[in-house]
Amino acid sequence: MARTVLDSQLQLLDAQLLVMASSTEDALRTSIAALAARDAEAANAVIDGDDDIDHQEREIEGLCVKLLLTQQPVATDLHRVSAVLKIAGDLERIGDQATDIAEIALTLQGELDDELSAHLREMGDRACVILHDATEAFVERDAERARATIGEDAQINALFESVKSDVVRGIQDEGSVASNLVEALMLAKYLERVGDHAQNIAEWVEYALTGRYKGEVLG
């Protein structure tokens, strides 16, 4: 009977995490689309929705604490609960980055250089893909997919270096630091952080499934 209750609570925990992951991915995609279209309504929707993502994280934290206090989870269950807590934290931070991107969508002035714009678009696309892949690895309980996703962040890091070079070139061409170049650099930094958090999620998915974190057996 106790195991049945525990399994039910673990399933509820997984379901809550997937709702949060969906909300976070939607916020990220919407903020990037709002930036591309200079869509103030969509940008404001992302900003207004951040409190909901924060609330979902707190609900997950509460479920985890309740489960640990009232049930008797074995080691594999503890891996799962610990990973869910960590994943929820990374999702909340991605939600914050989506809000930051949406705020820039409201203030960005003028047009960016074509090459710089292309690099930012690719960063946004890659960030969304990595987050989606990490979430799918959790849904499918696929450790191999999680491991494959971990390596994808290197592409975002390389694009971030390209954006920095684009910005330096733009400053040299203009002879001054235009505000839109500063905002472009901030956008790239936010997207780079999204990639880092998505990689963290994939690493915690692998831990939940195998007990291995960054190649080491924990707990």
Name each model feature, range by range:
Residues M1-G219:
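Cytosolic, long alpha-helical scaffolding segments
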